[in-house]
A protein has these predicted regions:
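Acidic, polar low-complexity linker/tail segments
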Residues: 1-32, 37-47, 63
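Surface-exposed acidic, glycine-flexible loop patches that form ligand/cofactor-binding
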Residues: 23-24, 58-61, 113-118, 143
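Hydrophobic beta-strand segments of well-ordered beta-sheets in folded domains
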Residues: 29-33, 65-69, 119-127, 148-157
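Active-site-proximal, acidic helix/loop segment immediately C-terminal to a metal-coordinating Asp/Glu
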Residues: 43-44, 134-138
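An active-site-proximal "capping" alpha-helix that borders the catalytic cofactor pocket
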Residues: 47-70
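Von Willebrand factor
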Residues: 75-124, 130-136, 155-165
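Mature extracellular/periplasmic domains of secretome proteins
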Residues: 139-146
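P/S/T/G-enriched low-complexity
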Residues: 163-179
Length: 179
C-alpha cells in the first residue's frame, strides 16, 4: 500500500513529467502503465489501485485517460491492452494476472515502448529488482530524446517510494552492471 510520502512523490514526479515543454498540452491524456510480471499479484493489484486513486484525486487530467496496460512477462513477451482508469482503480484487470519468471531487460522494454507507446505523455513502470540492462548504448538510443523524460519507474522495495525518471534508471542500471 502506498503511504502518504509515496503518494506525494508520485504526484510531484507526474507533475514534472507532464510539464516538460512540449509534452502535454491538454485534452485527453494518453498514458502507459507497465507491470513487471515478476511481481506478486497482491502487490500489483494494490499498488496499481493506489496509483490510480492517487492520480485521480490529484488532478482533473486523470478523469479522462486513455490507459495502455503493458504486462511485461519476459523479454520476448509483452502484452498490450487498453483499459479504463476505473478498471485499474478497482483492480479488475488483474483477475487473471499470474506471476511469471523470466528474463526482463530494460533493452526489450525500451524498444517496445519506443515502437508502440511513444505517443504516451506519461509512462509509469512498476518494476521488480530483477530488471537488468544488456546493451547500454541501445537502451540510450531507445530512451533518447523523449522516453527517458516521460517515463517513471517505481522499484518494488524502494525505501522511500521515490519514482525515478527513465534516464536516471538507465544510469542506475549501468552502474549496477559495472559492479
Amino acid at each position: 500500500m502506498m503511504n502518504l510520502i509515496m503518494k506525494e512523490n508520485l504526484n510531484n514526479a507526474v507533475e514534472q513529467v507532464l510539464h516538460v515543454k512540449g509534452n502535454y498540452a491538454g485534452g485527453i491524456l494518453e498514458m502507459t502503465l507497465v507491470i513487471d510480471c515478476g511481481l506478486t499479484k497482491a502487490y500489483v493489484a494494490e499498488t496499481a489501485a493506489d496509483l490510480a486513486a492517487t492520480l485521480r484525486s490529484h488532478s482533473e487530467v486523470f478523469r479522462n485517460v486513455r490507459l495502455n496496460l503493458v504486462l511485461f512477462k519476459c523479454d520476448e513477451r509483452l502484452e498490450n491492452q487498453v483499459i479504463s482508469f476505473s478498471f485499474l482503480q478497482m483492480s479488475s484487470c488483474f483477475e487473471e494476472y499470474q506471476e511469471q519468471q523470466g528474463k526482463r531487460t530494460l533493452d526489450a522494454l525500451s524498444a517496445n515502448l519506443k515502437l508502440f507507446h511513444a505517443r504516451s505523455k506519461l509512462i509509469l513502470v512498476l518494476a521488480g529488482e530483477s530488471l537488468t540492462m544488456e546493451d547500454p548504448q541501445k537502451v540510450h538510443e531507445n530512451m533518447a530524446p523523449f522516453l527517458g523524460k516521460k517515463s517513471l519507474f517505481l522499484f518494488q522495495g524502494a525505501i522511500n517510494g521515490s519514482w525515478l525518471r527513465g534516464d536516471a534508471v538507465e544510469r542506475l542500471l549501468a552502474q549496477r552492471e559495472e559492479l
